[in-house]
Every structure is written in structure tokens, then in C-alpha cells.
Amino acid sequence: MFISFEGCEGTGKTTHSSYLFEKLSKKYSCVLTKEPGGGLFNEVIRNILLHSYNKQIDFHTEALLFAADRAEHLSKLIIPALQQNKIVICDRYLDSTIAYQVYARGLSKDFVLNINNLALNYMPNITFYLDLDPKIGIQRVKQFRPKEINSFDLQKLSFHKKVRKGYLDLYQKDQQKRIFLIDASKSLEKIYNIIEQKLKEVFQIDL
């Protein structure tokens, strides 16, 4: 089973994916990972993409780096884990690329999907999209992880609004009902309960 967490900056993706991993690991064989990142090679790419000098990288180059990271991530970690019937929990996946590179950066959707062709064959069974006003999200970032601010955190509010629009469009056009929207302004406990209830309801996962 493949579970992903999506959302703009400061929505709690890392917090909730980590908590779910902790809960599920008590009863199931699980893997917690993230994008970009997830392996030695992936961490090198992550450092390039999230460093402040990323502002100088061409948007197509940036998208290709994300695609390279995902291809390596899939082949070395996600696919093997799924083949071993493990539950994979991923902090960001392909939806992030569409929201950020297509909606916010303005790249062609066809270009982005073509370079991420492998990922289209391994889409999550369920995606928890944590929705929040970008202004509040950035405030959270500055408050709770001031020493970990990356190149995307530094973008203008207008950029983050485009990202959110991208996510909302993906949610509204999701015919497979893969994406489950959660109001990220709710308390951590309420969000945990919503996630647990959805997994029990749809996949009969006992937490």
C-alpha cells in the first residue's frame, strides 16, 4: 500500500506522515520516506533543489532534477518496498511536482508528466492533501522551523497561492477519488483522527 501526504509549506505533512508511520509500524511493516530525498543520491539532489542558490536554476532543469530524484527513489526504495507488501508513507510525491512546477512555475503539464512517466505507474492508493491558507503556512514555517527555511519557503506569497490552486485543481479533478482533502487549520489531534478514520473506512487498516 502506498500513502502520500501533500500540501503547501507549513501544512504539517512531515508531522502527520511521521505520526502515521509511528502508529502503523506497531502492527505493520512500513517505510517512511520523502521527496526530494529518500536515499544517498536523492539527498544530494535535495540539497541542490532546496538550497538558496536554487533561485539561479532554470525551471526546466529544476523539474528534471525532481524527476531524476523520483526515478531513483522509485527504483531503489518505493517499488522494492511495495513488492515486499510493505506500507510506504511518502512526504510529497508527483502531485507536488504538478502543483509547483506546472501551476506555480508555469511549465507545460505534458513536459512534466513525460519526464515523470515512471511515477504514473506507481501512484499512491490514497493521498492526504492538507489544505491551508498559504499565508498561515509560511507563518508556521517561520515560527516552528526558522533554521530550516529552504528556497521554496522564500518564494513570494503569490507563488504559494498558485501552488495551492494547483492542489485544489488536482483534488477537484480527481476522478479516482485518490486525494482526500483535510483542513490543516484543525488541531493536530483532529487531523490524526480524520486520517485514522479514513484508513479504517477505505482500507480496513486497524490502527
Swiss-Prot record:
Protein name: Thymidylate kinase
Enzyme class name: transferase
Protein function: Phosphorylation of dTMP to form dTDP in both de novo and salvage pathways of dTTP synthesis.
E.C. numbers: 2.7.4.9
Pfam families: Thymidylate_kin (PF02223)
Binding positions for ATP per the UniProt entry: 7-14
Lineage: Bacteria, Bacillati, Mycoplasmatota, Mollicutes, Acholeplasmatales
GO molecular function: ATP binding; dTMP kinase activity
PROSITE patterns: THYMIDYLATE_KINASE
SUPFAM superfamilies given in the database record: P-loop containing nucleoside triphosphate hydrolases
Listed InterPro entries: P-loop_NTPase, Thymidylate_kin-like_dom, Thymidylate_kin_CS, Thymidylate_kinase
Alphabetically ordered keywords of this record: ATP-binding, Kinase, Nucleotide biosynthesis, Nucleotide-binding, Transferase
Cellular component GO terms held in the UniProt record: cytosol
